């Protein structure tokens, strides 16, 4: 199986600073690529569950995610290795599965890498991914990364 585990703030919802809910708009390009992703999609955020729901609803992509893992529902925060193990267990991930983990913070990507996930750095400086051995891929946006995954380009 293939799974996508997505951070929320500054990864799916690019805002780089204070977020005002009124400014969040649906992103039809992102929605298209998320719908085309070849596996189940999950949110893993250090924000609260209510915040995640609010943002995903405003982006009109809430229904595309199977589950939200948030700090108030897991009682853990990234980059906790225990959190990554709990997510693996809850989803039912096996060693034969492929997990794409999308995040903007390098320390969170280390958590995913340490757990056997394929890491995707979403960041304006994504070209510098070579500086970090635990970052497999770097992109300016989730849409750009999913375009490659969904068109079967090897990442």
Annotate each PLM feature.
Residues 32-57, 69-71:
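Substrate-recognition element of Asp-dependent hydrolases with the DxDx(T/V) motif
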Residues 18-42, 78-81:
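Short, acidic loop-to-helix structural element flanking the phosphoryl-transfer center
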Residues 2-4, 14, 24, 57-67, ...:
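Asp-based, Mg2+/Mn2+-dependent phosphohydrolase catalytic module
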Residues 27, 45-48, 105:
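Helix N-cap/beta->alpha junction signal
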Residues 7:
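Active-site residues of response regulator receiver
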């Amino acid at each position: 199986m293939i799974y996508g585990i997505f951070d929320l703030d500054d990864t799916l919802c690019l805002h780089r600073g204070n977020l005002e809910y009124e400014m969040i708009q649906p992103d039809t390009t992102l929605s298209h690529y998320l719908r085309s992703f070849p596996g189940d999609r999950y949110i893993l955020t250090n924000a609260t569950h209510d915040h995640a729901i609010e943002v995903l609803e405003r982006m009109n992509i809430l229904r595309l995610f199977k589950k939200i893992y948030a700090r108030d529902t897991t009682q853990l925060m990234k980059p906790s290795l225990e959190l990554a193990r709990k997510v693996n267990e809850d989803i039912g991930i096996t060693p034969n599965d492929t997990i794409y983990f999308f995040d903007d913070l390098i320390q969170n990507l280390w958590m995913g890498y340490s757990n056997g996930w394929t890491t995707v750095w979403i960041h304006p400086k994504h070209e510098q991914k070579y500086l970090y051995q635990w970052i497999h891929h770097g992109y300016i946006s989730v849409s750009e990364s999913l375009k490659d995954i969904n068109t079967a380009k090897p990442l």
